[in-house]
């Protein structure tokens, strides 16, 4: 069912049924069976003081274009780093939803996450081994990285900077634990939103002699534990509000396409091109596919799945096709079905460069045409209606970003 077909300004509850086979026997599980409706892992909001208010399933609502007197209450966030300082601000959204579960005039209508849902270029040292192993487990095979003469499991925590700078031609100065394989990118998304995907224990670092490195590692563990405690709340938020996401640079790598020189240098590196493609494929799977699934053709999906389904043995042609397809795909801009309509623009892959090292224009002519085309495809948009524009990269005061 298309999201726009749901009734507007009406509280909607839902359940999910997962079907699978054990041998020839088909089995099904729902949210209750998965332990997601009770206890610490519950993704529902309850009012313990008034039984009439209790809703025993996750809920959401859709604000519509005919609700002219109904507010569009937007929650907005960006730049969420698991080892960042302080508390996870995304948890604030949980309190806002909990305070207005059935009051749709006050309850947040949508959540906009407008860049850097992960920091691929600056993963935490205590997590990197787990991300590598978890990523391999997810795929069922260990991805071969062109130009890397060793396995990712053979690279220690904090030891990736040289590969990133010299071989991938990236400019991140914090790339000691830069994500590389598709599996690592996928694992990073899965631990960012679900506590059950975390390691039971963090890898010891007692073998490191340098006190400064040890201290940094221990600080990162404390920061990660703080983020970890907020994850049940984060999952509940995402289960109870329509959420739309767009990338900026850190979802792929710091300084992504910041200048023509950067773009051309990385294009000349098979290693760098493969990492960017892996990041884009993971962005599609974990962020933007849910924004508007109709944007992605069977050809696009096949281009990704053919590579990932090769069980660790993709041939050179399959890998090249995967990388080239993602590097030459530019239809990331999309419209969120709000009123006014919201256009999320891709301000990274359709830039215009007037010089080798100078700041770019955020959008080239094709990018501007994409915005126009995307807007007029919205069936309830009429010329002259207001539009919300979401740009992950700053529009005003923009220089090199």
Tell what function each PLM region has:
Residues 1-401:
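Metal-dependent phosphoester/phosphodiester hydrolase catalytic core
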């Amino acid at each position: 069912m298309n999201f726009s077909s749901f009734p507007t300004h009406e509280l909607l509850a839902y359940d999910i049924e997962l079907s699978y086979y054990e041998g020839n026997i088909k089995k099904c599980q729902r949210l209750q069976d998965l332990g997601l409706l009770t206890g610490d892992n519950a993704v529902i909001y309850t009012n313990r003081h008034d039984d009439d208010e209790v809703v025993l399933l996750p809920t959401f609502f859709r604000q519509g274009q005919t609700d002219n007197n109904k507010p569009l209450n937007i929650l907005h966030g960006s730049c969420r780093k698991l080892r960042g300082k302080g508390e996870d601000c995304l948890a604030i959204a949980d309190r806002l939803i909990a305070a207005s579960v059935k009051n749709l005039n006050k309850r947040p209508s949508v959540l906009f996450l407008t860049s850097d849902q992960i920091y691929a270029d600056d993963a935490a040292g205590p997590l990197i081994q787990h991300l590598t192993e978890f990523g391999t487990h997810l795929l069922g095979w260990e991805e071969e990285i062109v130009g890397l003469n060793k396995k990712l499991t053979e690279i220690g925590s904090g030891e990736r900077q040289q590969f990133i700078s010299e071989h991938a031609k990236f400019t991140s100065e914090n790339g000691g634990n830069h994500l590389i394989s598709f599996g690592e990118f996928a694992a990073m998304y899965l631990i960012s939103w679900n506590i059950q995907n975390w390691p039971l224990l963090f890898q010891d670092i007692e073998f490191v002699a340098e006190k400064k490195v040890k201290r940094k590692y221990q600080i990162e563990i404390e920061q990660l534990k703080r983020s970890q405690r907020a994850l049940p709340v984060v999952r509940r938020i995402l289960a109870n509000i329509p959420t739309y996401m767009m990338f900026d640079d850190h979802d792929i790598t710091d300084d992504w396409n910041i200048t023509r020189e950067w773009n051309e240098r990385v294009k000349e590196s098979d290693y760098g091109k493969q990492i960017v493609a892996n990041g884009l494929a993971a962005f599609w799977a974990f962020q933007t596919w849910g924004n508007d699934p109709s944007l992605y053709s069977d050809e696009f999906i096949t281009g990704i799945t053919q590579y990932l389904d090769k069980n660790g043995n993709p041939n050179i042609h399959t890998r090249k096709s995967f990388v080239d397809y993602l590097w030459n795909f530019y239809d990331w801009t999309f419209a969120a079905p709000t009123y006014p309509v919201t256009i999320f623009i891709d301000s990274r892959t359709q830039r215009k460069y007037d010089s080798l090292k100078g700041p770019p224009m955020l959008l080239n002519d094709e990018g501007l045409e994409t915005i126009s085309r995307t807007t007029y495809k919205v069936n309830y948009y009429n010329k002259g209606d207001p539009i919300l524009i979401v740009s992950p990269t700053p529009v005003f005061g923009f220089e090199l970003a």
